[in-house]
Regions:
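N-terminal pre-triad scaffold of radical SAM enzymes
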Residues: 1-28, 47-67, 96-100, 117-119, ...
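Radical SAM enzyme [4Fe-4S]-AdoMet core and its adjacent flexible, acidic
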Residues: 193-196
């Protein structure tokens, strides 16, 4: 069975910092966060494609810091997503999100679990504090370690996102970040080149 993501963009919503490399509105092609109606339309519109192709999909909230968005809005989106994973488990087999390491705590993980979240990707980008500071990330490598531990302990599929070529980055820093990602025992890694 093939697996894919149905990406739902919440461009820059929930982000507390403007990182040196980021303009989610340009990257995603979306200028406003998705509404519940738009989410329903996206998921409804993909059902036949998924059935016909025999593909399963995770509903993926990307392009912002999902766990830092307005709590009521987040729960409304999760309610819609859970309705589809419950009603169409052969097509929608999970919910995933990306977020910042400093926006993870036990309370938010409990909420995500109760609404059927299955996977969390942390936008770590680097495990070097000098690189993180130079790129205005607003979190530290220790925040990544702490959030990673909490996510793993809570039983989610756990992914890390790495960016190569950031300001102040070096080949050795990238190698060190990769080694630390391995040590954190993540299930997946996304590696992005920095393009400005």
């Amino acid at each position: 069975m093939k697996q894919t993501n149905i990406s739902v963009f919440i461009p820059h919503y929930g982000c507390t910092h403007i990182c040196s490399f980021c303009n989610q509105k340009t990257i995603s092609g979306h200028s406003e966060p998705v509404t519940e109606k738009e989410l329903e339309s996206i998921l409804e519109g993909q059902l036949e494609n998924l059935k016909d192709s025999g593909t399963k999909a995770q509903i993926a909230f990307f392009g912002g810091s999902f766990t830092a968005i307005d709590r009521d809005y987040m729960i409304r989106l999760l309610t819609v997503a859970k309705r589809y994973t419950d009603a169409y488990p052969e097509q929608y087999d999970g919910i995933r999100c990306s977020t910042r390491p400093d926006c993870i705590d036990e309370e938010i993980l409990g909420i995500l679990k109760s609404y059927g979240m299955t996977a969390i990707e942390l936008g770590a980008q680097s495990m070097n504090d000098e690189v993180l500071t130079a790129n205005r990330r607003g979190h530290t490598a220790q925040d990544v370690r702490r959030a990673s531990r909490l996510i793993k302990q809570s039983g989610f599929e756990f992914g890390l996102q790495m960016m190569t070529g950031l300001y102040k980055d070096t080949e050795q820093y990238c190698i060190d970040t990769a080694k630390e990602f391995i040590a954190l025992h993540c299930d997946t890694v996304r590696i992005y080149p920095t393009v400005i």
